[in-house]
């Protein structure tokens, strides 16, 4: 069966949380803050690929999600950024919002790439909050959520042949 229209649920990755940590050494009981920042969430991109014939992959698996960013760690270690999710669709695919039927983008050329959803920013660790006034900050920020949405993929095809009249 040929699938030329399908509904999908897409979600970008969430940013990692910041970390609260303090330097610990043998003869230094009160070390400074060294909590790392969280990693950025993965983006969700769409690529037009000539090797994909129809939208069959999205009919049987309608939910696609990018990876989340990792949280920060002690020792000023920042979290790793989330891996991007790359979705391959055939050229001629139109992406529109499911609720409002607004066309978001069209992928007409082969190897055309569009970033549809952006991943969330990573949170800040306590090392970024230190100052001359506040030398032992115990605050951090959470990572931002990634963008998400419900979309409809529509494949526009052009017929190679046309029949006029009734075929016998």
Predicted regions and their residues:
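Conserved P-loop NTPase architecture
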Residues: 1-167
């Amino acid at each position: 069966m040929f699938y030329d229209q399908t509904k999908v649920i897409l979600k970008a990755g969430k940013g990692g949380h910041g970390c609260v940590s303090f330097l610990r050494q043998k003869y230094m009981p009160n070390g400074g803050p060294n909590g790392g920042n969280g990693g950025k969430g993965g983006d969700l991109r769409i690529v037009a690929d000539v090797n994909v014939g129809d939208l069959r992959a999205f009919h049987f698996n309608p939910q696609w999600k990018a990876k989340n960013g990792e949280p920060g760690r002690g020792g000023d270690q920042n979290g790793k950024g989330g891996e991007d999710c790359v979705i391959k669709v055939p050229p001629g695919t139109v992406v529109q919002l499911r609720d409002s039927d607004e066309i978001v983008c069209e992928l007409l050329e082969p190897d055309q790439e569009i970033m549809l959803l952006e991943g969330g920013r990573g949170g800040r660790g306590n090392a970024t909050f230190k100052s001359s006034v506040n030398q032992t900050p115990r605050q951090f920020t959470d990572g931002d959520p990634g963008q998400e949405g419900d979309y409809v993929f529509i494949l526009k095809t052009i017929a190679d042949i046309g029949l006029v009249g009734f075929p016998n």
